[in-house]
C-alpha cells in the first residue's frame, strides 16, 4: 500500500517535471543555484548574450578557462555573460565542493564570470535546464579531421557505437550560445575552435 502510494507520487513528480521542461519557452523559465546555494532565476539575464558551459577542473580541456575568461573580459561590456556549471559526470574530473572549485578557478585562471552549483547534465538527475538545452540543440558530431575531435569520437564510439545519435552532453566544456531573448542558437563541442565561437559572440554583441 505504502509502496503503491510512493510509486504514484514519483510518477506525478516525473510528469510535472516533464511538463515544466517541455512547456519552457526560453532559458528564462529556469531557476538554478549559485555557488552559495541561493536560487537564481535565469530571467535575471534577460537582454544578455549568454554562453552556458559545463566545466571540470581536472580535464584536458580545463585550460579553456583561460580562453573563456578572455572572452568574458573582452565582451562583458557589450552585455555578454558566461554561466558556468561544474559537472562531475565525465571521468569524475570535477571533484570537490563548489567552493573548492571556485577557489581553484579564481586562483589558477582568474575566473571572474559566474559559477553555479555543481549539477548533472545527463541522466535521471540531470538539471531541467540541460534537458531543455539538449532538446533545442542536439549533438551534431565531432570534426574528425581535427586531432582532438578524432580522439573524442574514437573514445566515445568504443563505449557506445551509437553515441552520436543521442543528444546527450558528450564531455566537459560543451557550450551553448544563447541570444538576448533567451533562445538557444548554437551548441559547441569541447573540440570546436574557440575562434569560431568568438566570431559568433562578436556578431551578437554588436
Model segments located where?
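Bacterial N-terminal signal peptides that target proteins for export
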Residues: 2-11
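Bacterial N-terminal signal peptides
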Residues: 10-21
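N-terminal "domain-start" segment that seeds a small globular fold
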Residues: 22-43
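Conserved helix-turn-beta segment immediately C-terminal to the redox Cys motif
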Residues: 48-49, 57-58, 62-86, 105-109
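Thiol-based oxidoreductase modules, predominantly thioredoxin-like and allied folds used
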Residues: 79-96, 112-123
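Thiol/selenol-based redox catalytic cores and closely related redox-interacting motifs
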Residues: 110-189
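Non-catalytic, surface beta->alpha helical segment in thiol-disulfide oxidoreductase systems
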Residues: 186-205
Amino acid at each position: 500500500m505504502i509502496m503503491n502510494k510512493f510509486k504514484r507520487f514519483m510518477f506525478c513528480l516525473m510528469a510535472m517535471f516533464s511538463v515544466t521542461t517541455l512547456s519552457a519557452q526560453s532559458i528564462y523559465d529556469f531557476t538554478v543555484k549559485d555557488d552559495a546555494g541561493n536560487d537564481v532565476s535565469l530571467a535575471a539575464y534577460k537582454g544578455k548574450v549568454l554562453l552556458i558551459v559545463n566545466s571540470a577542473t581536472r580535464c584536458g580541456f580545463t585550460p579553456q578557462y583561460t580562453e573563456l575568461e578572455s572572452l568574458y573580459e573582452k565582451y562583458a561590456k557589450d552585455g555578454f555573460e558566461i554561466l558556468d556549471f561544474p559537472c562531475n559526470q565525465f571521468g569524475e574530473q570535477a571533484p570537490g565542493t563548489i567552493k573548492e572549485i571556485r577557489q581553484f578557478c579564481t586562483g589558477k585562471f582568474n575566473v571572474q564570470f559566474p559559477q553555479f552549483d555543481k549539477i548533472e547534465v545527463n541522466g535521471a538527475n540531470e538539471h531541467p535546464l540541460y534537458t531543455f538545452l539538449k532538446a533545442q540543440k542536439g549533438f551534431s558530431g565531432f570534426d574528425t579531421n581535427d586531432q582532438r575531435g578524432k580522439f573524442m569520437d574514437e573514445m566515445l564510439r568504443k563505449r557506445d557505437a551509437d553515441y552520436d545519435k543521442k543528444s546527450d552532453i558528450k564531455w566537459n566544456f560543451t557550450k551553448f550560445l544563447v541570444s538576448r531573448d533567451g533562445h538557444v542558437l548554437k551548441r559547441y563541442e569541447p573540440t570546436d575552435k574557440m575562434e569560431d565561437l568568438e566570431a559568433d559572440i562578436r556578431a551578437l554583441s554588436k
